[in-house]
Amino acid sequence: LPSHGSEQFSIELRGAYEAIKGLEGYTDQNYIEYSAEAKLMFPRFLAPFLSKSFRRRQTASSELSVSWDMQNRPEFYRRVFSTAWRYRWAEPRHHLNWRIDLLDLNYVYMPWISPTFKNDYLDDADNRNAILRYNYEDLFIMKIGFGITYNNGIDAMRANIETAGNLLNGAAKAFGLKKNGEGQYTLFNIAYAQYAKFDFDYTHLMQFDKRNALALHAGFGIAYPYGNSRVLPFEKRYFSGGDNSVRGWGVRELGPGKFRGTDGRIDFINQTGDLKLDLNAEYRTSLFWKFQGAFFVDAGNIWTLRSYDEQPGGQFKLDEFYKQIAVAYGLGIRLNFDYFILRFDMGMKAINPAYENEQEHWAIIHPRLSRDFAFHFAVGFPF
């Protein structure tokens, strides 16, 4: 909605649904997420510390956003309130877009945790998931970030870096605040996160003719918790598998490393890590009308940077990680309506690092549909 001063106000609503597999002891088996975001965009830099010539750039904008996210899982409910002030500007001649998150505040609130999940995995200090306890408590995240994207239609690149908690940690030490029983500084009795995170994505499109193309993609991410955080916040951790990753696995079903759960119930919650690698190749061809076909090969995994007893085989090691790269292959059907694309991907496991025996590790040689097949529905291309 434009205003008289050329400012623009927008509201965005999103929803997601996931049917969770392999969960026992819970009455609900579904994951539902709703979110709403309001943005007020000014078509100029609102920053007195910048030069007038820089602020006059027509492609620059300042943005104030407020959002609310509601996540309902069988094990817990999570609410995230966020507000941010950021700057964006573009260099069309060089196909570049820049973003600075000057200040991004997030408050993570946990209104409900299932008694089953709480008793089995959070309250028992000897339980193998005790190290993740703080990820299911209320939390503040105060971060700053920088991002750059490049896209000329053939090559696309995206890089982001963010840090959180450094200003709060410096203030806590300067004012001589005391730590809580968990060894953390708090703000209004709520701990704040401290970490650094870097993400990089690159895609190359080889267009053979109007009907056929090959898309190559590589993605890498690494995040390190320190200071006031022993592990990354749940929202900042990496997961593998799903419609935009290694498509032979469902969301959060792969990794870290060669880790494989032993109870078969709740381990997918812990299948997250601090480092992620994705490698993808997808051949795309036009079929008829709005239908397009695809054949893809995906590879990747996630790892932890530290060794956790709770995730054996999950730590990244330079001399072992390449043996833990999962591989999948499959076919896809897409409905391309120009303004949006409906995507149906069917993936099969080819190499499963969670198993060492030949029949399950080399799934491409010994395929089993019930064990190795994954179906994905999504909107838009995977990369």
Regions found by a protein language model. Name each.
Residues 16, 23-221:
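Transmembrane beta-strand segments of outer-membrane beta-barrel domains in Gram-negative
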Residues 19-28, 234, 313-318, 325-327, ...:
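Short beta-alpha connecting loops at secondary-structure transitions
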Residues 4-8, 61, 93, 154, ...:
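Strand-connecting loop/turn motifs
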Residues 299-316, 339, 347-365, 381-383:
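C-terminal beta-signal and adjacent terminal beta-strands/loops
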Residues 90, 134-332, 375:
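Extended beta-strand-rich architecture
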Residues 1-4, 29:
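Membrane-proximal, glycine/serine-rich, low-complexity loop/turn segments characteristic
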Residues 17-22, 73-76, 165-169, 222-228, ...:
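Flexible loop/turn segments at secondary-structure boundaries
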Residues 335-340, 369-383:
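Outer-membrane beta-barrel "beta-signal"
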